[in-house]
Amino acid sequence: VNLSTLFFVFAFLPVSLILYLLCPRVCKNALLILVSFLFYAWGSPVYLLLLLLVTVFNYCIGRDIGNRVESEQRGAKFVLVFGVLFNLLLLGFYKYTAFAIETLNAFLPFTLNAPSPALPLGISFFTFTNLSYLSDVYHRRAPGQKNPLDFCLYVSFFPKMISGPIVEYAHIAPQLKEHPVTLDKVSDAVPMLVLGLAKKVLLADNLGTAFQSISALSPGSLSGGSAWLGAIFYSLQLYFDFSGYSDMAIGMAKLFGFDFEANFDHPYLSGSLTEFWRRWHISLGRWFRDYVYIPLGGSRVSTAKCVRNLLIVWILTGLWHGASWTFAAWGLYHGILLLLEKYPLKGVLEKTPSPIRHILTLLAVIIGWVLFFSPDFSSALFYLGRMFGAGSRAFWDSTAKYYFATNWKLLLIGILGCGPWIRTLYQRLVFSRRGLGLALSALLLVGIFLLCVPYMMNATYQSFLYAQF
């Protein structure tokens, strides 16, 4: 299932939108649920029943919590804990059982057989969606949902189902009953859809091809320069892939009358890791802040407990992305660096010139992505070793020169695309008082869209990276 396929762009989305606009108001949510289930079945038909059962379960648990929370606090808390454990155990079974058993096998004198069930599409995202609902109802941030169709739509709404953004229930609850489609929403949605699609098929997929070519090099052929180019290609690919999906999801939500909050805010312009994580995958960071970090005590505790809380959150963040120790190490890596920024290095960094802080942040993030994309620690250490001069090959050898010479234009466009300049130029065209500006902006969008079509026709398109999480 992919938002950047010809079938989705030219058939599934427009047909769904036309039916939605023609549908009577009382049936609109039911139609969106049907469309969302068809979308899910397109990508994961085996687990459609699981999605439905999980949705029914959480609806019932939420109703029970809502009925108890005012008069029976202890009972409501018991039901909340039961609901949370059920969701986490389900996620754990499908995503972490094999990982846990493989880890145990390393210490046991015998070998346990690890089950390997296929991962249900979007399970990490819809699990966090359900946990948000149960917590928000218990803490009275929003009333429990009485209408089962409205709740089903909250969980299964197809634009956010596969790769987010993770929409907290308290934010979306007021929109579930009434979400009118307006001209302003449509005018915001179309550029987000087109530019999000362009990020994916024009930038992310081509950057991914360059990264895969470097990853395919034999260990003896990988020089320091090639390794750095590969890490930069991946850093840009991941950003454009995921932010492109988020833009498309937010744009599609607007077409159906919903307002989702932004999920990215030019993270590679950050001057610190703290700032980077306020700008990257904003909905996930907000979820961990609201439902894990703050309940643990947040920053309003002793320094030792604050350190504990931050490390717990970041190890969990790493494991949320994938069931392996490299993901856990990636989370721990960022947790430690954030603690260093917060405590011993705070004064030093405040006195450091902004350009240097920006470069240091980029270096820290790129090094972290090596852990993120490496299948195991030995691969990560080998790759990092090459980046920092290990091995007998010249740093900037003929292979590195070749990859730079064949991809420098893509690299330049990618770097420029990380900033707000292209969007600012488009907005200036749109808000120009002259009709010419509006016409030029429309032509620009049409041109970008037409440029995307040949890439969508290519049968070797790549699925969105975050769909695997």
Regions found by a protein language model. Give the residues of each.
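Membrane-embedded transmembrane alpha-helical bundles that form the catalytic cores
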Residues: V1-Q468
